[in-house]
């Protein structure tokens, strides 16, 4: 995954030193894009080991519309622990907005079901968009959405997805984001009888925290290995029927993990 390493290299070379909400400080660039052909392998970073179990369970948690970390804790996933309140609640974050967006007339919109219906019925539509950025709910969220909006595109029997991410923790978060939205694209493509196309990742503020710079440089010393393959249970045709056991990752041969502190 040279695209990811190129992003880190770009930020180390051209990044602006900035303060941030967490008080850690960052090297930051504004506006950057990566593209991944999902036909050539599953874009999971190989220059450090990624916790695939967390990636899959987090995505399933979003798709369930849940915003309490109980499901994650029961499945050994701790990536949201730092933000949850004493009851495990996170407020109306991703899962709520994806599945239960509250409209001004009092109706509730399931954006995931809606966008899948659009892909099936009007694949040339330019409105196949899911948004997590609900301005009226931001103050109720424990963490405002970083991956804000994604759009689907169908051409030549292939489904592509573009994500706009307003804020990107390059070292810790971005490998998860790439894999998560690529996996979501594979799942929706299967449910819509399409082949996977591209995952396009567009950033607003892409940054390396100042206490991640040495880890980033270590990762840049490692030569990327061949991408793994992600196999989905081909019998699943409803996006909400997928379970953890329906995913099998083949030929993942990463370098050892690199630890880094989370900026909260």
Curated annotation (Swiss-Prot):
Q: Which Pfam families match?
A: Thymidylat_synt
The catalytic activity, as recorded, is:
dUMP + (6R)-5,10-methylene-5,6,7,8-tetrahydrofolate = 7,8-dihydrofolate + dTMP
Q: Where in the cell is it found?
A: Cytoplasm
Binding site residues for dUMP? 21, 126-127, 166-169, 177, 207-209
Q: Biological process GO annotation list?
A: dTMP biosynthetic process; dTTP biosynthetic process; methylation
Annotated residues that bind (6R)-5,10-methylene-5,6,7,8-tetrahydrofolate are located at 51, 169, 263
Give the record's subunit note: Homodimer.
Record-given protein name: Thymidylate synthase
Organism this protein belongs to? Nitrosomonas europaea (strain ATCC 19718 / CIP 103999 / KCTC 2705 / NBRC 14298)
Gene that encodes it: thyA
């Amino acid at each position: 995954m040279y695209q990811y390493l190129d992003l880190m290299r770009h930020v180390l070379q051209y990044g602006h030193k900035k303060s941030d909400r967490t008080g850690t400080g960052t090297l930051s660039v504004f506006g950057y894009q990566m593209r991944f052909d999902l036909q050539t392998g599953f874009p999971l970073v190989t220059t450090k080991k990624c916790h695939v179990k967390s990636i899959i369970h987090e995505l399933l948690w979003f798709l369930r519309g849940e915003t309490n970390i109980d499901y994650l804790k029961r499945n050994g996933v701790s990536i949201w622990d730092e933000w949850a309140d004493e009851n495990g609640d996170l407020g109306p974050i991703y899962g709520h907005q994806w599945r239960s967006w509250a409209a001004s007339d009092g109706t509730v919109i399931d954006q995931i079901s809606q966008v899948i219906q659009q892909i099936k019925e009007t694949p040339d539509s330019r409105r196949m968009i899911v948004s997590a950025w609900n301005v009226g709910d931001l103050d109720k969220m424990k963490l405002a959405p970083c991956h804000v909006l994604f759009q689907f595109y169908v051409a030549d029997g292939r489904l592509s997805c573009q994500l706009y991410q307003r804020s990107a923790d390059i070292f810790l978060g971005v490998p998860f984001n790439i894999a998560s939205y690529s996996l979501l694209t594979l799942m929706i493509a299967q449910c819509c009888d399409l082949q996977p196309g591209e995952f396009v990742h567009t950033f607003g503020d892409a940054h390396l925290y100042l206490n991640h710079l040495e880890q980033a440089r270590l990762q840049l010393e490692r030569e990327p290995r061949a991408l793994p393959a992600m196999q989905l249970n081909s019998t699943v045709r409803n996006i909400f029927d997928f379970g953890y056991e329906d995913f099998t990752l083949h030929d993942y041969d990463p370098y050892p993990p690199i630890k880094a502190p989370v900026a909260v």
